């Protein structure tokens, strides 16, 4: 596995997809990095030469430095997202309340579905109806 920006990227995937394993880098950013490095995005990581991997590292680092004020990666981005959610909960906004209650935030229905957010069903035991 190649290590770029402190993250091990998978060998068996195409380079453009492997770079998206870095939290904060999506497909378009990955394509921009590879274009600057003059590397075909369809090559698999395992087929890259050491010089090409070094070039990707260098270009990615320069790309992050050049866009530092608006591009956050890995730990910084995770921390920012967590702080944003915490701030929403503290100010008591609708979105913050939904986060606090563990319900869907973006307006999805909750009468049915929403199981991912709400967790497994909590069944209510119903009383047996006595027959006379």
Swiss-Prot record:
It comes from the Bacteria. Residues 101-132 are annotated as: Disordered. InterPro entries: Rbsml_uS13_C, Ribosomal_uS13, Ribosomal_uS13-like_H2TH, Ribosomal_uS13_bac-type, Ribosomal_uS13_CS. Residues 101-125 have a biased composition (Basic residues). GO terms for molecular function: rRNA binding; structural constituent of ribosome; tRNA binding. One of its GO terms (biological process) is translation. The keyword Lyase does not apply. It holds the Pfam family Ribosomal_S13. GO terms for cellular component: cytosol; small ribosomal subunit. Keywords: Ribonucleoprotein, Ribosomal protein, RNA-binding, rRNA-binding, tRNA-binding. Part of the 30S ribosomal subunit. Forms a loose heterodimer with protein S19. Forms two bridges to the 50S subunit in the 70S ribosome. Belongs to the universal ribosomal protein uS13 family. NCBIfam families: uS13_bact (TIGR03631). Located at the top of the head of the 30S subunit, it contacts several helices of the 16S rRNA. In the 70S ribosome it contacts the 23S rRNA (bridge B1a) and protein L5 of the 50S subunit (bridge B1b), connecting the 2 subunits; these bridges are implicated in subunit movement. Contacts the tRNAs in the A and P-sites. This is Small ribosomal subunit protein uS13. It comes from Ureaplasma parvum serovar 3 (strain ATCC 700970).
